[in-house]
Curated annotation (Swiss-Prot):
Residues 22-35 form a propeptide. It comes from the Eukaryota. Contains 4 disulfide bonds. Belongs to the Cnidaria small cysteine-rich protein (SCRiP) family. delta subfamily. It comes from Acropora millepora. Its main location: secreted. It is found in: Secreted; Nematocyst. This recombinant protein induces severe neurotoxicity on zebrafish larvae (Danio rerio) at a concentration of 230 mg/ml, but does not show toxicity when injected in blowfly larvae (Sarcophaga falculata). All fish incubated with this protein died within 200 minutes of exposure. Has also been claimed to be implied in calcification, but this function seems improbable. This is Small cysteine-rich protein 2. Keywords: Cleavage on pair of basic residues, Disulfide bond, Nematocyst, Neurotoxin, Secreted, Signal, Toxin. The keyword Signal applies. GO terms for molecular function: toxin activity. Residues 1-21 form the signal peptide. One of its GO terms (cellular component) is extracellular region.
Amino acid sequence: MRSQHVLILLLGLVCASQVLGKHLTKVKAKALHYDKRGDCDWPTGVCFYIHDPCPPGLRRCPQHDDGCYLPTNHCCCYP
């Protein structure tokens, strides 16, 4: 009888961990997707090397510099 209770408990833990694991994976995927996008991606702007000027037609927008993946980049925004 005791081994049946242990088995049921183990099966319950395995099922719960499977459900929780899938949920955490989806949450992590959403967070990763948001992190990958950044604040300086299209349609906002494009990241360029910090010592290069923004190309013609784009304006410097330092408020989005943190959205660039590399600290040596700055953001140039579309008008």
